[in-house]
């Protein structure tokens, strides 16, 4: 085997792919199981996979044999017609019988041997087939009745004549006979169960031990386990053994409990994180004020005195060229509007106006950047001064789309830009 092995399993043991374990290893597995070792311990000791150990032990507890089944080819059919008829008979005698009980009866009555006994899954498959055949027979009888009723062309008075000839009313009589037969044979089944061999009973008890049962913990045990879980989520083997001696539980059960408790704690922690994130989300995204803050922001009051247009002059300048240019323009109605329209003075630093960047020149004293309001925006203007300063040096506009326009510094060429600004 060492020269022909085709792989190494997770535990470091060698195996031949597609070939069963040697009989010596199988015998050791059974001996360790009888000595009280768990399948997981046997797997580590013999370096055999846990699934292989469980399968060999399960077959041993059911059949008492450690020999492997047939390799290659098709397995011999164990559900022969004789076995199927016996299974159907047992099911008729006791409709609530289990598959493993049928299997034990087949062995005890000598219908099958350990070599050709069908497995529990095979017996369940036979029972499903029998149930489906019975249901199909009942459905066929109903279809026959419907076909006969649909094919009848006589009057309503002749239709009841078909009912006695159908197969459906006959079924309750047949079921009644089966129930009577079952009632008569239940005593036989009880007596046959009482005559089971001691070996089958021992195997049955070992099989019961192999099957898992849910452990019900007392309140004291749960409190002790929870207290230990608060101390550490991963107790070592010494802590588990100490806890097992304290609360009178197997160490394996305690290990399983901690594994399940850790999984529950992870689920609860995930839910707590989700709730924490959900509670923190609204503080970052205000919903009620999103429209007002993103579209229409209120314009704050200016902190510095601001002067605006008056009806007498547009630009507070002494230059005759600019004065003549302005006087040549047609009068704008925006300078003589009513006083009842509200106006909020904007901040000059905002970009909501046309900025006429007029550089300083020798003929202009203290000239800086001026703001000018286009005609279509003048409806929001007030003819009275908005600032507190007496000097009229800068004109203001209302909020709007701002486009900076730079005007050259030469004074004689300034007149060509005024029509463009209108």
Curated annotation (Swiss-Prot):
<dbReference type="InterPro" id="IPR017970">
    <property type="entry name" value="Homeobox_CS"/>
</dbReference>
<comment type="subunit">
    <text>Interacts with MAF and MAFB. Interacts with TRIM11; this interaction leads to ubiquitination and proteasomal degradation, as well as inhibition of transactivation, possibly in part by preventing PAX6 binding to consensus DNA sequences. Interacts with TLE6/GRG6.</text>
</comment>
<dbReference type="GO" id="GO:0000976">
    <property type="term" value="F:transcription cis-regulatory region binding"/>
</dbReference>
<dbReference type="GO" id="GO:0000978">
    <property type="term" value="F:RNA polymerase II cis-regulatory region sequence-specific DNA binding"/>
</dbReference>
<protein>
    <recommendedName>
        <fullName>Paired box protein Pax-6</fullName>
    </recommendedName>
</protein>
<dbReference type="Pfam" id="PF00046">
    <property type="entry name" value="Homeodomain"/>
</dbReference>
<keyword id="KW-0804">Transcription</keyword>
<dbReference type="GO" id="GO:0004842">
    <property type="term" value="F:ubiquitin-protein transferase activity"/>
</dbReference>
<feature type="DNA-binding region" description="Paired">
    <location>
        <begin position="4"/>
        <end position="130"/>
    </location>
</feature>
<dbReference type="GO" id="GO:0060041">
    <property type="term" value="P:retina development in camera-type eye"/>
</dbReference>
<dbReference type="InterPro" id="IPR009057">
    <property type="entry name" value="Homeodomain-like_sf"/>
</dbReference>
<dbReference type="GO" id="GO:0000122">
    <property type="term" value="P:negative regulation of transcription by RNA polymerase II"/>
</dbReference>
<dbReference type="InterPro" id="IPR001356">
    <property type="entry name" value="HD"/>
</dbReference>
<feature type="region of interest" description="PAI subdomain">
    <location>
        <begin position="7"/>
        <end position="63"/>
    </location>
</feature>
<dbReference type="GO" id="GO:0006357">
    <property type="term" value="P:regulation of transcription by RNA polymerase II"/>
</dbReference>
<dbReference type="Pfam" id="PF00292">
    <property type="entry name" value="PAX"/>
</dbReference>
<dbReference type="GO" id="GO:0003309">
    <property type="term" value="P:type B pancreatic cell differentiation"/>
</dbReference>
<dbReference type="InterPro" id="IPR043182">
    <property type="entry name" value="PAIRED_DNA-bd_dom"/>
</dbReference>
<keyword id="KW-0371">Homeobox</keyword>
<feature type="region of interest" description="Required for suppression of NFATC1-mediated transcription">
    <location>
        <begin position="345"/>
        <end position="422"/>
    </location>
</feature>
<keyword id="KW-0539">Nucleus</keyword>
<feature type="region of interest" description="RED subdomain">
    <location>
        <begin position="82"/>
        <end position="130"/>
    </location>
</feature>
<feature type="compositionally biased region" description="Low complexity">
    <location>
        <begin position="281"/>
        <end position="294"/>
    </location>
</feature>
<dbReference type="InterPro" id="IPR036388">
    <property type="entry name" value="WH-like_DNA-bd_sf"/>
</dbReference>
<keyword id="KW-0563">Paired box</keyword>
<dbReference type="GO" id="GO:0007423">
    <property type="term" value="P:sensory organ development"/>
</dbReference>
<dbReference type="InterPro" id="IPR043565">
    <property type="entry name" value="PAX_fam"/>
</dbReference>
<dbReference type="GO" id="GO:0005634">
    <property type="term" value="C:nucleus"/>
</dbReference>
<dbReference type="InterPro" id="IPR001523">
    <property type="entry name" value="Paired_dom"/>
</dbReference>
<keyword id="KW-0832">Ubl conjugation</keyword>
<feature type="DNA-binding region" description="Homeobox">
    <location>
        <begin position="210"/>
        <end position="269"/>
    </location>
</feature>
<keyword id="KW-0238">DNA-binding</keyword>
<dbReference type="GO" id="GO:0050768">
    <property type="term" value="P:negative regulation of neurogenesis"/>
</dbReference>
<keyword id="KW-0805">Transcription regulation</keyword>
<dbReference type="GO" id="GO:0030900">
    <property type="term" value="P:forebrain development"/>
</dbReference>
<keyword id="KW-0217">Developmental protein</keyword>
<dbReference type="GO" id="GO:0000981">
    <property type="term" value="F:DNA-binding transcription factor activity, RNA polymerase II-specific"/>
</dbReference>
<feature type="region of interest" description="Disordered">
    <location>
        <begin position="269"/>
        <end position="311"/>
    </location>
</feature>
<comment type="similarity">
    <text>Belongs to the paired homeobox family.</text>
</comment>
<dbReference type="GO" id="GO:0045893">
    <property type="term" value="P:positive regulation of DNA-templated transcription"/>
</dbReference>
<feature type="region of interest" description="Disordered">
    <location>
        <begin position="162"/>
        <end position="201"/>
    </location>
</feature>
<dbReference type="GO" id="GO:0007420">
    <property type="term" value="P:brain development"/>
</dbReference>
């Amino acid at each position: 085997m060492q020269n022909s092995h085709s792989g190494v399993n997770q535990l470091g043991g060698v195996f031949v792919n597609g070939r069963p374990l040697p009989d010596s290893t199988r015998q050791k597995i059974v001996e360790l199981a009888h000595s009280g070792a768990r399948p997981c311990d046997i797997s580590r000791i013999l370096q055999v996979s846990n699934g292989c150990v469980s399968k060999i032990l399960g077959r041993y507890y059911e059949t008492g044999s450690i020999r492997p089944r047939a390799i290659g080819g098709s397995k011999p059919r164990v559900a022969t017609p004789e076995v199927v008829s016996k299974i159907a008979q047992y099911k008729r005698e006791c409709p609530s019988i289990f598959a493993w009980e049928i299997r034990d009866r087949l062995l005890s009555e000598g219908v099958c041997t350990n070599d050709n006994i069908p497995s529990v899954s095979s017996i369940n498959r036979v029972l499903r087939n029998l149930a489906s055949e019975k249901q199909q027979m009942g459905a066929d009888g109903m279809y026959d009745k419907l076909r006969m009723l649909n094919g009848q062309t006589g009057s309503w008075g002749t239709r009841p004549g078909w009912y006695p000839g159908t197969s459906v009313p006959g079924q309750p009589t047949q079921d009644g006979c089966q129930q009577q037969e079952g009632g008569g044979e239940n005593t036989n089944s009880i007596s046959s169960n009482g005559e089971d061999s001691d070996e089958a009973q021992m195997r049955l008890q070992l099989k019961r031990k192999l099957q898992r049962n849910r452990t019900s913990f007392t309140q004291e045990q749960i409190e002790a386990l929870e207290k230990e879980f608060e101390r550490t989520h991963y107790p070592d083997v010494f802590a588990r053994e100490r806890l097992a001696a304290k609360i009178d539980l197997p160490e394996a059960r305690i290990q399983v409990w901690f594994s399940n408790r850790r999984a529950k704690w992870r689920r609860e922690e995930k839910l707590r994180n989700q709730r924490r994130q959900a509670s923190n989300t609204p503080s970052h995204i205000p919903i009620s004020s999103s429209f007002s803050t993103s579209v229409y922001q209120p314009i704050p009051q200016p902190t510095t005195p601001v002067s605006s247009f008056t009806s007498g002059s547009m630009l507070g300048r002494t230059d005759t060229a600019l004065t003549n240019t302005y006087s040549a323009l047609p009068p704008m109605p925006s300078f003589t509007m009513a006083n009842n329209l509200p106006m909020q003075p904007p901040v000059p630093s905002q970009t909501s106006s046309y900025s006429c960047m007029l550089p300083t020149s020798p003929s202009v004293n203290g000239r800086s950047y001026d703001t000018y309001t286009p005609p279509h925006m003048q409806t929001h203007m007030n003819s009275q001064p908005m600032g507190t300063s007496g000097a009229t040096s800068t004109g203001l506009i209302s909020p709007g789309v701002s486009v900076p326009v730079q005007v050259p510094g030469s004074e004689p060429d300034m007149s060509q830009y005024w029509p463009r600004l209108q």
